[in-house]
UniProtKB/Swiss-Prot annotation:
SMART domains: AICARFT_IMPCHas (SM00798), MGS (SM00851). One of its GO terms (molecular function) is phosphoribosylaminoimidazolecarboxamide formyltransferase activity. One of its GO terms (biological process) is 'de novo' IMP biosynthetic process. This is Bifunctional purine biosynthesis protein PurH. Belongs to the PurH family. InterPro entries: AICAR_Tfase_dup_dom_sf, Cytidine_deaminase-like, MGS-like_dom, MGS-like_dom_sf, PurH-like. Residues 1-147 form the MGS-like domain. Pathway: Purine metabolism; IMP biosynthesis via de novo pathway; 5-formamido-1-(5-phospho-D-ribosyl)imidazole-4-carboxamide from 5-amino-1-(5-phospho-D-ribosyl)imidazole-4-carboxamide (10-formyl THF route): step 1/1; Purine metabolism; IMP biosynthesis via de novo pathway; IMP from 5-formamido-1-(5-phospho-D-ribosyl)imidazole-4-carboxamide: step 1/1. It comes from Haemophilus influenzae (strain ATCC 51907 / DSM 11121 / KW20 / Rd).
Amino acid sequence: MADRPIRQALLSVSDKTGIVEFAQGLVKRGVKLLSTGGTAKLLAQNALPVIEVSDYTGFPEMMDGRVKTLHPKVHGGILGRRGTDDAIMQQHGIEGIDMVVVNLYPFAATVAKPDCTLADAVENIDIGGPTMVRSAAKNHKDVAIVVNNHDFNAILAEMDQHQNSLTFETRFDLAIKAFEHTAQYDSMIANYFGQLVKPYHIAEEEEANAKCGQFPRTLNLNFVRKQAMRYGENSHQNAAFYVDLNVKEASVATANQLQGKALSYNNIADTDAALECVKEFDDPACVIVKHANPCGVALGKDILDAYNRAYQTDPTSAFGGIIAFNRELDEKTANEIVERQFVEVIIAPKVSAEAQEVMKRKKNVRLLECGEWTSRSERLDFKRVNGGLLVQDADLGMVGVDDLKVVSKRQPTEQELKDLLFCWKVAKFVKSNAIVYAKDNQTIGIGAGQMSRVYSAKIAGIKAQDEGLEVAGCVMASDAFFPFRDGIDAAAKVGIQCVIHPGGSMRDQEVIDAADEHNMVMVLTGMRHFRH
């Protein structure tokens, strides 16, 4: 396919970042400018020669700007096939438009405002913009469509290399971006309006109707491929990593990789688990994860202390694990890790220059800097099933001291309460059935993923015993209620002093009585944290 010279461009943008400089570059290269409304006014204010679309078409903007570019002289100039439609274009006075520069009304920003009304949303549905974008993308053989201001400099550079022309490869790539842009835009609109109707399949359920505003009738998702991978969870599976560009919260998706090999599928999944867990803590914390489960979590006076205590829980499982911190990774901690263990990934809000130098001794270790976080943003979680998608709120629920209900005769001490809340936060990130033993803000044993809650407790005890850690005097957290007293009896045998769990079983009183028989503290949270 041939290069196409850019002689005339139509510019109509809502986000005007960089548009003046780009227009100046086009004019410098001999390109004639057409424009509309606010964009035309801005270009004229910067002494750029610009023709208003209404002057070109002979038809004024009308209906408060709702109709500006919906005209045959505009779309004929964009859609006209060079070499095929030249005669009809000349007959009707239609000039070829070789480049269209458009970004759309800020619908997402508008509906995100707390005071946004339906009328506000409707007025921010762009009509002319997407129409021009689709027209130009369809005719990419002859026309360049630009929807992202990050492409401005590269386009001008290519024009310089190709006598003010753009290659077919570039035009095709720009067309793909354009279709992605309009697809995402329409998806946002569909999702917004879909939240305003009652779900037609479950109209008889009043409670579901009350909550329907959270989940649109049709769910449209837009993710951008960030990374192609050698393979997926297993070597026979192909894989790629897609990200939501609207998410700004510190995460594995937004993190900056400072060194190391490319992240694998499992690296990303495990790093996400580690980072989301360490975000739960305010004091200096370290979380070590293996196969998406915490194998060691601790708080400390600093992150070196926290790391040493987290590692102590299960050094065997920590080998080849993922380490997450909620403070800057410093030189001392980096050196301790390098000297002590093999690690796949380290992630922290920030990494000091000295720590980076230390980590260069292990150049294959993936070192990530994710930035600071101040709060957890509300979001949806997804689980794919064959033929469907389960959607729910992300589990951001946590409890504080004031939310706890002490149901045992013995009351917890201040330190026991701290340990119970620490233990509860960890249990939230352990696969169900989850049992966590902890003491002095350090995990002592973790039992994960067992079909029987009692066996998860046994595994937690075995883990502690294998590492020479004392279970006696520990607190225990369970992600869900105890259906029978056997779990409490087993905990008492190994010296557990306090138990925290949601409660809600038909046999709660039987379980509470068991705690009292063993002079244990029992605290209910009223909140379950299943994790499958």
